[in-house]
């Protein structure tokens, strides 16, 4: 599906598509307006992907938190199955960080990430793809976690080993193709916190080197951290799930920054 294939069209005689907001491997997201001028994000999946659409709808309708982007409705279009999402103004966290907002503001966004994940974990759900590209930051520094493509019940058993997620943020158990629980989201959040503090990921290099880093290499120490901050970061990034915080809510309770 081309990224501009729906631009300029009116769908279901209601939603006027203006432009694509982003395109991933699984779907294309467009900016659309209803007849009253209200903006929405319209996520269109390839034809035949109803099951994937329905799964994301199932996850989204169980969530209700200001730091999670609402899933409003599922639509059946001629172009393919779709989801109507709330429009989240702002930009991806990576672009936002490139403008050097400062550590204090970045940590404020990180805390909102923990709040969003804590809500998911309380509902028995795991995001599975926590990364800056899935965190939208508005001009007021309000953040929303988006994209529940890979989300689902905690420790959901897959029919076959499946590595889900994005390489720099994969927990060791995800590298091994194991079913991830909330601790996998905690690990990914730890990678983001390390990136905020250091300006780079803890493990860099060729894909094989990054995978090995997640599995076996110690986290490179960061100078200037106090004992509480250092211990907190190490626990987020522990190799074994049982050595991490059990959920984002638990990590939030002792957030030292």
What is the predicted function of each stretch?
Residues 74:
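Activation-segment/catalytic-loop signature of the eukaryotic protein kinase fold
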Residues 185:
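Conserved catalytic-loop aspartate of Hanks-type protein kinases
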Residues 49-62:
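AlphaC helix of the eukaryotic protein kinase fold
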Residues 225-238:
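Conserved C-terminal C-lobe helix
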Residues 115-125:
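Protein kinase catalytic-loop region centered on the HRD/HxD motif
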Residues 109-110:
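Activation segment signature within eukaryotic-like protein kinase domains
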Residues 78-92, 96:
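Conserved short submotifs of the Hanks-type protein kinase catalytic core
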